[in-house]
Amino acid sequence: MYRVLLADDEQIERMALARRLMRRFGDILQISEATNGKEAVQLYEKEHSQIIIMDISMPELNGVEAAEKIRSMDEDCIIVFLTAYDEFSYAKRAIVIRAL
């Protein structure tokens, strides 16, 4: 069973992605959801998700900041950003922390 953490402040986006993942891989996934970056870090500390899929623009702690905190705890988890942001500074920071 793979533990997946979805972090996005838009509930409809989280629900749509969770639904697609469960439809395709439901028998091998356990999905948790966070509504902001701070909550994502807290859930990660509790559940140690192997795959984290998150938005960049979120309240309290943005996705890149949350990913940096998670990466400092776990060098091996997979971090993927799903975002409409096109600002290169976010992409550079994502590359530094080995996120996709």
Feature names for model-found ranges:
Residues 41-100:
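CheY-like receiver
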